[in-house]
């Protein structure tokens, strides 16, 4: 699928009334990280950004948020790293406008061909976006290229048993892996070391499905979407 076509279709997904009922004007579009203290989906989304940000050094100077969505996550990263240049990246011009409208920096670029200088970033973040990249492996290689030695890749990602359930256009065929260890091997193949992942499905995907069920009338659809995911993971890796 052409990048412009994908971006337009994904904009429509984000703008869907059911999704707006879930997220409102929060600027988020992720499943969140839930705990006993979580008040609502928006606070869960804040917590997920914090989880992805946790491995990044407080002294980071440049942080790239690749696939930045509507910008709430980029803005939160900028608040966490006030001395860093935090930049969102996206293909969608509408999403870029929304991100900039929230006071965050953002640039138009393809995750598989980042328009960023080599050895220029301290951290690359992909929060629920790498599954869509064409391809995820190309993104891993690009993240390796743009990171400085010692830089960190931090992702929140989903692996699917059946990606067609959410729409065959949303997950390119090369990204359709279901095994967590295989995902790690793809990261290592790009050159990364200190690769560490953890399955956090019970505190991300599972409670999100509960929230989703409140706005979807067809619970069969919700159950199919719920069972399509094999792992919701958090991963960190280091560019040697």
Indicate where each model-derived feature is located.
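Short, glycine-/aromatic-enriched active-site segment of Class I SAM-dependent methyltransferases
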Residues: 158-174
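A short acidic, Gly/Pro-enriched loop at the edge of an enzyme's catalytic core
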Residues: 112-124
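N-terminal auxiliary segments of SAM/dcSAM-dependent transferases
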Residues: 1-22
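Conserved alpha-helix/loop element of class I SAM-dependent methyltransferases that forms part
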Residues: 42-59
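Conserved catalytic loop of SAM-dependent methyltransferase domains
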Residues: 196-217
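Short alpha-helix
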Residues: 175-191
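A short glycine-rich, Lys/Arg-flanked "PGG" loop and its adjoining helix->strand segment in the class I
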Residues: 137-152
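Class I SAM-dependent methyltransferase SAM/SAH-binding core
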Residues: 64-113
């Amino acid at each position: 699928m052409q990048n412009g076509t994908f971006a337009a279709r994904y904009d429509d997904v984000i703008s869907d009334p059911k999704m707006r009922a879930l997220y409102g004007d929060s600027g988020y579009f992720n499943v969140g990280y839930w705990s006993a203290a979580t008040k609502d989906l928006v606070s869960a989304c804040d917590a997920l950004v914090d989880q992805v940000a946790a491995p990044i050094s407080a002294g980071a100077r440049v942080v790239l948020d690749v696939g930045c969505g509507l910008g709430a996550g980029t803005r939160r990263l900028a608040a966490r790293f006030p001395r860093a240049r935090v930049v969102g990246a996206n293909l969608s011009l509408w999403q870029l406008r929304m991100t900039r409208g929230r006071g965050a920096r953002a640039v138009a670029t393809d995750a598989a061909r980042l328009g960023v200088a080599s050895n220029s970033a301290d951290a690359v973040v992909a929060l629920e976006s790498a599954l869509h990249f064409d391809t995820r492996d190309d993104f891993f290689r690009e993240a390796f290229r743009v990171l400085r030695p010692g830089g960190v890749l931090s992702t929140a990602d989903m692996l699917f048993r059946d990606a067609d359930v959410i729409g065959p256009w949303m997950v390119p065929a090369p990204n359709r892996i279901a095994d967590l260890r295989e995902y790690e091997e793809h990261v290592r193949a790009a050159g990364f070391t200190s690769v560490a992942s953890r399955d956090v499905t019970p505190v991300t995907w599972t409670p999100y499905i509960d929230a989703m069920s409140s706005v979807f009338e067809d619970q069969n659809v919700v159950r199919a979407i719920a069972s399509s995911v094999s792992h919701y993971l958090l991963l960190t890796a280091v560019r040697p």
